[in-house]
Amino acid sequence: FQPGTHWRYSTCADILGAVVEVVSGMRFGEFLRKEFFEPLDMVDTGFYVPESKRNRLVTAYKRTENGLVPWTSTHLAVGVYDREPAFESGGAGLVSTLEDYSHFADMLLAGGTYEGRRILSPATVACMTQAQLKDAVRRDMWDSLDGYSYGHLMRICAEPGRIAGLACEGEYGWDGWLGCYFANAPQDQ
């Protein structure tokens, strides 16, 4: 389909990560470290967990008919954090802490700055955190995303009355593979 006519969840973030590698001449993780993690003081974020920090990595669980059991499977190598991955995905696989993730969320709320340092331009933050999909295109989204739109790599609350959980209009955020989630509500600052 033509861009702007439909919505489909895709591997676009993975492709963007590969483009970043070609343009920057760096591995994706190195680019993220230099451009985001270091300026944002994100000291516990990356695509693998060093041996010295593995005791801090929580065990993920899944619900089965016999109760909760540790999650041991992987998907596209996401879940294997004891070594650097061959492919650093633009769409999955980062490991972080609540503290580190909050620095990224705070930077977005501050319009692209963190502790006086410019990380992203205000225009980039606006592109990420404002609804970009036309109403007709939003109809293509999964039922579980009813009431949401998308910015660029960010989910945006467009109609809070249609959302199954707690949300307010303009709230934006993202969720991770094993249930982590962040949301900013800029109007509530």
Language-model features: locations:
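Short, surface-exposed loop or secondary-structure junction motifs
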Residues: 1-169
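Conserved strand-loop elements at the edges of beta-sheets that form or border functional pockets
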Residues: 9, 174-176
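Residues at beta-strand starts and edge strands
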Residues: 150, 188-189
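Short, surface-exposed beta-strand/loop micro-motifs that present aromatic residues
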Residues: 171, 178-187
